[in-house]
């Protein structure tokens, strides 16, 4: 999980400081903000001469950046597709739950995967049909190319068929939109969700570090470091 990645960084920091110098450019998944921050902090204690930058441009851009070598490490919050593996390698560094979030005023506390599928494809359009108050459901999601969107749509089986009212370019923007609208529902990285919105359970299982680890929470995906196959080890 993201917390495990942080612990790994702290462990690495306990080793003797090295003598490397230079810059490492990372970019991609906005959901990996907390993970890359924790790893960067730990790495800085081991190799203080290396500067690590992070550009939150989305998973698709992270994979592209690693492919065309504009990034040293691309960050993807989804597994690599077969046609993307020709030029780059993917290394899983953490697992993350995709939390289903609603406004804090919502009466809905649990949804099934089937209900989510019907809601996001427009078959269910009113909250009263899933135990909430009478009101039109407002679907908030991520933009095409987002790893979070890809993970959610693949697991819920709604690939390219969602009826989004809003398609936003960052995890934080989705959370803010759901916070501001009592009728909204969206999805976001567990590592990014705070107390401004409510997380619903999925088929009775909460989205947490423990349920992601043991696999009981169904809507989860990997966090992946993407590196170019042709880059020499000294360059990476």
Which residue ranges define each predicted feature?
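Exported/periplasmic ABC-transporter solute-binding proteins
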Residues: 2-236
């Amino acid at each position: 999980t993201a917390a495990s990645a942080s612990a790994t960084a702290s462990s690495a920091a306990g080793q003797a400081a090295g003598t490397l110098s230079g810059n490492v450019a990372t970019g991609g998944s906005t959901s990996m903000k907390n993970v890359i921050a924790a790893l960067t902090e730990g790495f800085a204690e081991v190799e203080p001469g290396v500067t690590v930058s992070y550009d939150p441009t989305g998973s698709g851009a992270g994979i592209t950046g690693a492919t065309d070598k504009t990034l040293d490490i691309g960050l993807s919050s989804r597994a690599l597709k077969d046609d993307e593996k020709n030029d780059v390698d993917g290394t899983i560094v953490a697992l993350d739950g995709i939390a289903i979030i609603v406004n804090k005023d919502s009466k809905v506390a649990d949804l099934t995967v089937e209900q989510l599928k019907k809601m996001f494809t427009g078959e269910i359009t009113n909250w009263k049909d899933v135990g909430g108050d009478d009101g039109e459901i407002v679907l908030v999601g991520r933009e095409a190319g987002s790893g979070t969107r890809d993970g959610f749509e693949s697991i819920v089986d709604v690939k390219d068929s969602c009826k989004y009212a809003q398609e936003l370019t960052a995890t934080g923007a989705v959370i803010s939109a759901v916070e501001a609208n009592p009728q909204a529902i969206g999805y976001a990285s567990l590592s990014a969700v705070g107390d401004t919105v409510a997380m619903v359970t999925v088929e009775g299982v909460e989205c947490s570090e423990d349920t992601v680890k043991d696999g009981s929470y169904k809507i989860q995906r990997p966090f992946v470091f993407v590196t170019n196959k042709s880059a020499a080890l000294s360059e990476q």
